[in-house]
């Protein structure tokens, strides 16, 4: 019995020692984030724009292309916050409980946090893959619901995966097959990642372009020419949604992960946010 008590105490101490101090929380709990500031930046006296970076499904703030984009933005004097959505990697929550609406709530919580930073002059949003859907809909919510503590000055979408709605409606998502009208408690993608019934049903009902279209500021959309996961029509439909405010840049030879020409992608993103600062 004494041995069991000691083991329990050690376990609890371990949890306490490695507990994370989350500054922002979403529907599933604390959100792990990384703030990157320009070199030599003094938060007491300086000010700069900031871009919130949103990763794709199953991905992380520390996976390509986010760290390189953050570094390139900093070189141009632009701060960034990249974070793990709820249920992903270092953030709290479960992947199986994740939905796109919950990720929008995460993004809005991060928006509110960025607005509270006194040295931030204006804010941009960037999203990759599912994060692109989240970023576009978040921008629309900000525009339509009056979240205007700081100006939203630009939106960058990297291979925005609006095809997820079609996939869930067709009952075929990545390598998972299911009845779209009555999906199981969860499906397993790539033999590891669980997506829950709530995700599979709610994604079918998203008004992606209708929500996104409320934002009328500048938009840059970047899509890899060799993207085999998200078809080009997704980006083309976003261009139709935003009209003349949007431009689509196709990076020839680039894949969906943006891992072959990451520097070029980071430079295109940075040039966009620097131009509109």
Q: What is the predicted role of each segment?
A:
Residues 18-44:
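N-terminal cap/lid segment of alpha/beta-hydrolase-fold proteins
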Residues 31, 133, 138-140, 148-237, ...:
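The alpha/beta-hydrolase serine catalytic core
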Residues 46-56:
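Short beta-strand element of the alpha/beta-hydrolase
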Residues 55, 127-132, 224:
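Conserved alpha/beta-hydrolase "nucleophile elbow" surrounding the catalytic nucleophile
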Residues 58-70, 85, 233:
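The serine-hydrolase catalytic nucleophile loop
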Residues 61-62, 88-118:
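Catalytic nucleophile-loop/oxyanion-hole region of alpha/beta-hydrolase
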Residues 70-92:
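Conserved alpha/beta-hydrolase
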Residues 118-129:
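Alpha/beta-hydrolase fold nucleophile elbow
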